[in-house]
């Protein structure tokens, strides 16, 4: 005991110093542990908030900030503005608010796809939503057009099947309105070409993801009935671009009677052409290679293979 007291008296300062160091280290460790727990709790809270936000925005996910076609980056401000309006539309649909969803559509989209709100409800809303909530992903396709993949919400339905995923293409128009159901846009053209006393005017083009519809007016100022096309050849009418690429018409959607134009008559016609939507495609003309300038004469021709068809080029 005496030796222990003697050791303590001789090393009292050192012992106190060691004790203070141990206490200091202990306090530091406690503080570090405390702040680590706070940081971890904050991360958990942020994660929960992110999940909640995702659920409130219908589980929407932006795939990338780059165009799927060109690979070019999209400006963050544009991306936010565009996805906000798409999210708004999807939110209306998820909540069964058909009226407000319909009001986000452009007038052109309404006219071409859904003339009435009932048409929109029956054709689009009931087909994709039908009272159910949906999850979806958004990916820029090209410029103002976005690919939206719509999937049954597993949290709402309790199941997820492969055949429950649908894809739509939604295009943002300048006034923050939408073209949906793969309808891209309307292009006003108003270009006319006259030849052989026949005038063809291209009024406008309705552009879809897989095809285009040209609205044209034909004025026949001749003394004979003309036939725009014999409609027996899938390649007799086509669009020609600056690289001499041809895009052929859907001849099965036209009937011969619509292609007949009496003398001094004017008629309106819509012709559908093949097209996988590309923003930079430059169409220069529409070509009719089997136009008949005198239909009565053509009818009397026994060997129609020898008939001298006229090629009419409409400049665009």
Features from the language model and the residues they span:
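Short structured motifs
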Residues: 133-135, 198-204, 252-257
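Short solvent-exposed beta->alpha transition segments
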Residues: 84, 98-147, 236-239, 243-249
């Amino acid at each position: 005991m005496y030796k222990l007291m003697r050791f303590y008296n001789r090393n009292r300062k050192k012992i106190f110093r060691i004790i203070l160091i141990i206490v200091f280290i202990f306090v530091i460790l406690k503080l570090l542990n405390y702040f680590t727990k706070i940081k971890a709790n904050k991360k958990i809270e942020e994660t929960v908030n992110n999940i909640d936000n995702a659920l409130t925005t219908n589980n929407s996910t932006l795939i990338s900030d780059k165009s799927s076609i060109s690979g070019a980056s999209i400006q963050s401000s544009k991306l936010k503005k565009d996805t906000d309006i798409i999210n708004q539309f999807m939110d209306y649909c998820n909540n069964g608010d058909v009226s407000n969803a319909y009001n986000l559509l452009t007038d052109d989209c309404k006219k071409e796809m859904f003339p009435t709100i009932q048409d929109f409800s029956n054709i689009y809303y009931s087909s994709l939503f039908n009272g159910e909530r949906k999850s979806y992903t958004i990916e820029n396709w090209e410029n103002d057009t976005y690919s939206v993949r719509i999937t049954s919400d597993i949290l709402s339905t309790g199941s997820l099947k492969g055949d429950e995923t649908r894809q739509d293409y939604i295009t943002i128009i300048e006034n923050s309105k939408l073209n949906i159901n793969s309808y891209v846009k309307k292009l006003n053209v108003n270009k006319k070409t006259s030849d052989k006393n026949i005038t063809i005017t291209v009024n406008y083009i309705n552009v879809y993801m897989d095809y285009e519809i040209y609205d044209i007016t034909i004025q026949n100022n001749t003394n004979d009935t003309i036939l725009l096309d014999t409609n027996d050849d899938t390649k007799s009418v086509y669009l020609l671009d600056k690289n001499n690429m041809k895009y052929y018409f859907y001849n099965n959607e036209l009937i011969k009677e619509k292609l007949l134009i009496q003398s001094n008559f004017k008629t309106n016609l819509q012709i559908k052409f093949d097209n996988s939507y590309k923003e930079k495609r430059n169409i220069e003309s529409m070509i009719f290679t089997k136009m008949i300038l005198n239909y009565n004469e053509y009818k009397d021709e026994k060997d129609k293979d020898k008939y001298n068809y006229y090629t009419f080029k409409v400049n665009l």
